[in-house]
Amino acid sequence: MEAGPVRWVSFTHVFFDCDGTLVGVEGIVELTRRRGQAMAVAALTEAAMSGHLPLEAVYEQRLALIRPTRAEIQELIRIYREHLLPDAAGVIHALHACGISVHLISGGLEEAVRGLGRFLGIPAQRIHAVRPRYDPFAGAWWRGEEGPAVGVEPSPLIAQDGKARLLEGFRAPGRRLMLVGDGITDLIAQGAVHLFAGFGGVFHRPAVAENAEVYIRCPRLAPILPLALSPERARALQGTPAEGILREGLQAFRNGEARFRDPVRHERFLQVWHAL
């Protein structure tokens, strides 16, 4: 917000990370539990998401440790749904009701992320994830059964700056882009969007907490609604269950569970919403 009249402009597009943001797990770690490699993969994942190792250095290394089958990746859809944050579906439904274009942008495996997106009512063309490459000869190929995933198709999302590069392609006159995520790849994309909200409700990553323009500490996504909507746009939620989620989100900003890095901007944001 600029100096002058206090106002907040609605966003046109909101991009959510998946693992550690919409859901309370890291999918790649869940895939390892049957392989006895959970600790090794969790350590690699945390190193990448905290910025200690570049994502491209660990992505295929993690996949090689577990070599998941298509059936196991499909099983992730169930795991994602079981660990979906309690208000995630309500927040996304409210954004849709207000005409916001909601996208998922994730370094996760495409089939699982798309399955979650279907459950949340997000069209496939708004889901951006990594497509695995299967070994067609390692399984029961004579019955049409593929072998395990042995790599991934080329994608910017397996690189540390991949989300930033992908989001740059969405910038256009009249669009306002917002990104919500918990990891270093999300933080790196901060310059590609008009607002980045770091999410620490599942995993606390110090670099994200210290550098995100907005940081959310609570294990809820309700603060996204007042960030994404203007008070005028939010009138569409009056009298619906989403109005309660909006109020919860504002309360998080008032009690410090969500905050702007710039305290002046934080106060001006609260002024915009003082009537609710």
Locate the predicted segments by residue.
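Histidine/lysine/aspartate-rich catalytic loop segments that bind and position anionic ligands
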Residues: 122-156
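Anion (oxyanion) recognition and catalysis
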Residues: 96, 118-121, 171, 191, ...
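A polyampholytic, Gly/Pro-enriched intrinsically disordered region
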Residues: 143-159, 220-223, 233-246
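Acidic, Mg2+-coordinating phosphoryl-transfer loop and its flanking beta/alpha structural elements
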Residues: 106-107, 174-216
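Conserved Lys-Pro-Asp/Glu-containing loop-to-beta segment of HAD-superfamily phosphomonoesterases
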Residues: 151-185
